[in-house]
Amino acid sequence: MIGDIIAQRYAQALFDLGKEQSLHEVELYDTALSQIEELLMTSNELTYFLHAPIFTIYEKQGVLLKLLELIDAAQPIKNFCLLLAEKERLPLLTQIINSFKVLLDNAKNIVHGQLITAITLDEKKQSELLISLEKQTNRKLELLFQVNPDILGGIVLHIGDKVFDASLRTQLECIRNTIKKGETNHAY
């Protein structure tokens, strides 16, 4: 919990620094951070090295600089990562990157979500549905399309912490509950 708050603060600081220049600069930061994240995900040894307290700050900074030069990271990203090493916040790097991406998505008015249907939709139907939902929400949506035959028909849309359930299964359950209530209200 505390780690999340700290990660959000570091992400906000980096985001604000980039935004002083332009949104394009923030996107460049995001590209570099994505490359760092990919390196961390593909190398358990690197992750261990950056997290392990047995290695000195200077050793970690040296390795970070070499990696950042390999991906041609901008100087502010280099400075940021060196600061994280100095403050011993490298174990929070993945959380910081995720928080940064959320800030960038908010700035670009992008919302991530999940759309569940009973059957597989072809690309044309997915595109039409996405355009329709974007018009209704006035936001750009990036949806993960999934199939769940248990919903019987219709859609279930998860956006952030909200769920919009327009599935046939839920509608049938509502009708069933209404009928049950009607039966219990008129029972002798």
Curated annotation (Swiss-Prot):
It comes from the Bacteria. It is a peripheral membrane protein. The keyword Transport applies. The keyword Heme does not apply. Belongs to the ATPase delta chain family. F-type ATPases have 2 components, F(1) - the catalytic core - and F(0) - the membrane proton channel. F(1) has five subunits: alpha(3), beta(3), gamma(1), delta(1), epsilon(1). F(0) has three main subunits: a(1), b(2) and c(10-14). The alpha and beta chains form an alternating ring which encloses part of the gamma chain. F(1) is attached to F(0) by a central stalk formed by the gamma and epsilon chains, while a peripheral stalk is formed by the delta and b chains. The gene is atpH. GO terms for cellular component: plasma membrane; proton-transporting ATP synthase complex. It comes from Lawsonia intracellularis (strain PHE/MN1-00). It is found in: Cell membrane. Keywords: ATP synthesis, Cell membrane, CF(1), Hydrogen ion transport, Ion transport, Membrane, Transport. F(1)F(0) ATP synthase produces ATP from ADP in the presence of a proton or sodium gradient. F-type ATPases consist of two structural domains, F(1) containing the extramembraneous catalytic core and F(0) containing the membrane proton channel, linked together by a central stalk and a peripheral stalk. During catalysis, ATP synthesis in the catalytic domain of F(1) is coupled via a rotary mechanism of the central stalk subunits to proton translocation. One of its GO terms (molecular function) is proton-transporting ATP synthase activity, rotational mechanism. Pfam families: OSCP. This is ATP synthase subunit delta.
